[in-house]
Amino acid sequence: MSYANNNGSLSVPQYISTIDLTTETKPKFVKYFYYTVFNFAKQYTNPLILPFPITLEIIYHGDIDIGANLFSSKTFAVEEVSGSKFHISGQGTAYFWYRYGHIDPASFDLIAQTAISNKDWLVLDAILHTRSFIEAIDFLVNNPQTWTIIAEGLDWQLNEIGARDLFAYLTNNSYDTRKLAQFLTILAYIDPDVLVKVGIPVYTCDNPNKTFEKYLNYLPASPLVPIYSELSEQSSEISELFIQTSELSDDVLALMAQIVKIYYQLSEQQSEISELNIESLIHSSEITQLFFITSEQSFQISDLFTETSEIIFNLDQLSENLILFTNAGQIINNFLKMVHLFKAVLIILKILQHAVKTIAPVSELGILTDLGQLLDNILGMTSESIFYYTSELDIRGIIQTLVNLINQLLGINITLSSECCEEQEEKEKKKEKEKEKKKEKDDDDDQQNNNNNDQNGLGLGLGLNFGLNL
């Protein structure tokens, strides 16, 4: 169920309260089990606008115009109106009691006693507002265990009308004499039995102001004396506290001076820390630069290491090539020695040939003639073999191979020109022709010597011809 007004739609609660405790000073909905309680805050507006319709009890005297109702009474009386908006005007005095919700008397007593036992004052105040003002006051008077909480100011409507001061008076606590006299005046007209129950006389006059004066004179001033003595004691305590505060103020000032000194020291240390931070940043930058330089040098060292590895590898290859070159040189030397040996043998054979050819014509031994022919054959075969071997030997290829090997070893470029090779070939051809001419000449000389042996006698002619063409 909800109620719509100018402020919007509100859920209608089961109960209301006007509780005035410290934690309950604002209007709000409170869930109590499956019940909802709405607390009304203090409100003094005119017109009085409430969030939903309620029953409003008016405790008044004089002429009061509220809404469409006009009430008039020379003494205090109670009237009821219902609604959510009330415009109030007239002359006199009026107090309001909000009444809302319904609960049977048996349930009321049970819930009220449970709330008192549990000190659930919100529930107690809520069910009080289901009763009329007179019924609520009768319940409180009949239950002294509620007097203390009411005297502390549980309900702001009871506080405004003076009920709080009545229960403060009954519990020997401080109260407002004028407000208590006002409430006693109201009770004398609307519920005098309450005054009888608490032992206060009932005064009624035609004019409520005169009744108020009587109760004002009735109330003793004695309850105020303890208040004054208590205030005096509190004043002396306050004086002592003031002296202690003065003494402590000196200590506080000294501590303040120390704090200021420490603050300046901390400021100086903070400045030093800032400078150290700046220096650390500078050093950090330098370290970063050194790191980059070191990284570059590391890369350079790595490159140098790679180049060194390549050089070592090349040196290893050079060493192997030198060994090969040395072996090749030894082979060539051995070959040259063999060539020289063959040439020496050839010379010896030619000497023997000359000797035999010279001796054979004058000798009677036929074996010398055979020996001469054998030497001719051997010499011819040997010459042909040497010529064939030396002609088949690729001198230019050997030289080119040696040149390439030297290029690899020394890292230079040596080339054999074609002209040089052609010139070498021409020289070799000339030498071959000269050999052939010498051979023919030798044959002619041998023939001439054979023809002239009778005339010239025994003679030994030696002709040596040695040629090594590389």
Curated annotation (Swiss-Prot):
Compositionally biased spans, kind Basic and acidic residues: 426-441
Positions of region (Disordered): 423-470
Stretches assigned to coiled coil: 418-453
Ranges of Low complexity composition bias in the record: 448-457
Keyword terms: Coiled coil
Coiled coil keyword on record: yes
Lineage top rank: taxon: Viruses
The name this protein goes by in its record: Uncharacterized protein ORF470
